[in-house]
C-alpha cells in the first residue's frame, strides 16, 4: 500500500495553529485520507467539477471547509486552505483564476 504525503499551504498551517480544536480534526482527517483513499467515504468530501482542475476536493467539518488537491502520480495531498464556508469559496475563485 502506498501512503500519500500531505503538504499544507502556509494559509492552511496558519489556520490549524490558530484554531486548535477544529484544526486537529482536519489534521486527523487528512492523515486518514493519506493512509488510505478509501477513507474518503467516511468524511463529507465532494469533488469540484472544473474543466481546469479535475482533482480538487473540499472536506467539510462543521462550518469549515478545506480545499485540497489529490495528485495521484506524486502520491500527494495538497491542502490549499481551511476557512469558514463563506470565505473558502471566495478564496477558491481567486486560486483557480490566478493560475
Residue ranges with predicted function:
Residues 14, 46-47, 62-64:
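Amphipathic, hydrophobic secondary-structure cores in small proteins
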Residues 1-31:
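Arg/Lys-rich, positively charged N-terminal/basic patches that mediate binding to nucleic acids
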Residues 1, 35, 40-43, 83, ...:
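Residue-level signal for pocket-adjacent positions within structured domains
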Residues 61-64, 69-99:
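Enriched for short, Lys/Arg-rich terminal
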Residues 2-4, 41, 55, 75-78:
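Residue-level signal for beta-strand positions within conserved beta-sheet cores that form or flank
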Residues 32-58:
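A short, surface-exposed loop/turn module that caps and links secondary-structure elements
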Amino acid at each position: 500500500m502506498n501512503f500519500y504525503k500531505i503538504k499544507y499551504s502556509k494559509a492552511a498551517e496558519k489556520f490549524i495553529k490558530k484554531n486548535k480544536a477544529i484544526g486537529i480534526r482536519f489534521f486527523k482527517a487528512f492523515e486518514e485520507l493519506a493512509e488510505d483513499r478509501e477513507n474518503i467515504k467516511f468524511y463529507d468530501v465532494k469533488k469540484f467539477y472544473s474543466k481546469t482542475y479535475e482533482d480538487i476536493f473540499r472536506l467539510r467539518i462543521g462550518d469549515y471547509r478545506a480545499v485540497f488537491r489529490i495528485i495521484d502520480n506524486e502520491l500527494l495531498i495538497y491542502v490549499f486552505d481551511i476557512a469558514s464556508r463563506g470565505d473558502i469559496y471566495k478564496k477558491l475563485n481567486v486560486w483557480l483564476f490566478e493560475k
